[in-house]
Amino acid sequence: MHIFKRNYTKFILLLLLSLFPKTILFAQENSLKTKYFTIYYAQDCSLAQLADRLHAASFLHIDIFPQQNNVQDIQSIVSDLFDSLYLEVSDIIDIHMYSFEGTIRIMPGREELREILGAYFKKVPNVASFYSHANNTIYFSWPDLTLGVLVHEMAHAIISHYFVVPPSTKVQEILAGYVEYSIRKKAGLQVVK
């Protein structure tokens, strides 16, 4: 009976998350629409910090924080950055889906991420990010979000939507790891071999 209640509770939580994702767990967040993603982020997540963390200047070839008064709109910079990274990931794995639309949720911390993961796993892993194919959403912990983590999860999203029968977990991890390596190298970041 206990197993039934636990599975029933998970089912109800997943159902509610898929029907009313913004109203249940994500009431204190902002959103940003890009060509390929709708990004929901915690109120304490600064878009300027996000652009800096993701090394926007490396991919958009702009000065994010100009010294003069011609400051660009940070929302358009972040939007362009996510779309540019999506296209870069697509180029690396040679999978191009221009009609792709996904969701990204940047959670305030790992505890909030663990709450969501509890709906998917009996034993909740302590991870910085997670891609859910079921609702086409990438989840991140704000303190742990880096360029490498973002493109790794983007690769999972692209791979999951391209193949009718998704590759094994090991193959997906190899491809996502290669994407992460390639992007970090292109951005001039330290590459772990």
Q: PLM features: residue spans?
A:
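Bacterial N-terminal signal peptides that target proteins for export
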Residues: H2-I12
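Bacterial N-terminal signal peptides
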Residues: F11-K22
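Boundary at the C-terminal end of the N-terminal hydrophobic targeting segment
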Residues: L25-E29
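Acidic/histidine-rich, surface-exposed loop or edge segments in extracytoplasmic proteins
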Residues: K33-D73, I158
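Soluble non-cytosolic domains of exported or imported proteins
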Residues: Q68-D83, F140-V149, V165-K170
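Auxiliary, metal-adjacent structural segments of Zn-dependent hydrolase domains
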Residues: Q72-A134, V192
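Active-site recognition of the HExxH zinc-binding catalytic motif
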Residues: G148-H161
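Post-HExxH zinc-binding segment in Zn-dependent metallohydrolases
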Residues: P166-K193
